[in-house]
Amino acid sequence: MLYVTVGALPLYVVRWHYGPLPTTLLETLVIITVVLYVVARWRDGVRRPLSTPYDIPIVLLLVAGAISVVVAKDHRGALGLYRAYFIEPVAVFYVAVDLLREADRRYRLVLSFAAGSSIFAILNLAVFAQAFVQHNVNVGAAPTALYTDANPVAMYLEPAVALAAGMILFGGTRRLKLIGVGWLALAGSAFLVMFSKGGYLAIAALVLVAIVTAPRWRLFLVGATVLATAGATQIPLVMQRLATIPPSLNGREAIFGATIDMIRSHPIFGLGLGGFTYQFRGVIPEIYPHNIWLTFWVEIGLLGVAAFAAIFLMLQWEGWRAWPSVEPTQRPWLWGALGGLILWFVHGLVDSPYWKNDMSVEFWVMAALIFTVARSALQVTGRRGVQASPQARD
């Protein structure tokens, strides 16, 4: 059931009510996944989740979220956000870190994500193609399927792009590389036609990571980057979008300034979940401050942003520390998950990844991949060290 949930992340847009309680198809899948897991483990005699190094910052994050529900003006709305962005995604994390201890399950999970994100990419490419044929493409509000805004589409697809690239760079079989090529062609194309400037910046950062970590591909990546950059300058729609960078920077400066003023007034607890409101240029309502760290601070306070930063940095530290010891078959997943979070870190300088139903679950699935691959690599290294020690030989 975890595979179905991961493949169906965009279906949070399917909404209905159980009486007065709103829900989504994604939330229903998450609840079914967690309940089935708990029942199965209870029958096996397991009464508590696996322990991870992230338990303390996760508890602090959940505490910060709970406080933000109390602080918020709309307690009911804040509780819904708390449930969708924190409680349920964290539950998925603990399910995943148990189930993904086996390598073949990681493979199936990534394939499920590939299938779901590829279908989503095809839908968005079809909508774009229709608009393009009709000469109706607005690069400032790119045509999308299911979602109402292009930036969330781009941010959802970024981990997919990273995992697909990881399969190409580090896949040990021809089949795996071909799957990566097909996945990258679909997810990458849909990502590009969202015309997300923050996304383009994030991809540039991922290319730098690839150049450093994949020396066999270094010359190819440098050459491909040069050709892609030169080619992009010949695409009118791309250049039209890049021409809006100066006013976008001015807009971000205004939003950041307003957010910082709000934080100064509420530095400890923030405004509570759903508390941020800003009329951009007096017309456009903004629900988040277009920066991942400002968003965490203004929504769930100083404790929340500190806890999330700790989790993020710990994931990167553990993942890259284990990288030299990771088995070749697991490198695509570790590199892709780490790369996906790097994409969000860079894109998060100018937008608010994580803060959607799909992306919050997506983050914790990437976290589970990083943890399980890194931990298995470190355990194998430890066993090898024991076997090689003089005491072991004696």
Task: Kindly label every feature range from the protein language model.
Residues 1-67, 77, 101-111, 168-177, ...:
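Transmembrane signal-anchor hairpin modules in multi-pass inner-membrane enzymes, especially those
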Residues 9-31, 45-54, 63-89, 98-108, ...:
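Interfacial transmembrane-helix termini
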Residues 15-18, 40, 93-98, 122-127, ...:
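Juxtamembrane membrane-interface segments at transmembrane alpha-helix termini
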Residues 31-36, 218-219, 338-345, 353-394:
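Transmembrane alpha-helices of multi-pass inner-membrane enzymes
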Residues 33-34, 62-70, 87, 91, ...:
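Alpha-helical transmembrane segments of multi-pass inner-membrane proteins
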Residues 79-80, 99-105, 129-137, 220-228, ...:
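A cytosolic-side transmembrane-helix exit/cap motif
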Residues 83, 96, 303-306:
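Hydrophobic alpha-helical transmembrane segments of multi-pass membrane proteins
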Residues 134, 237-300, 321-325:
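Long extracytoplasmic/lumenal interhelical loops at the membrane interface
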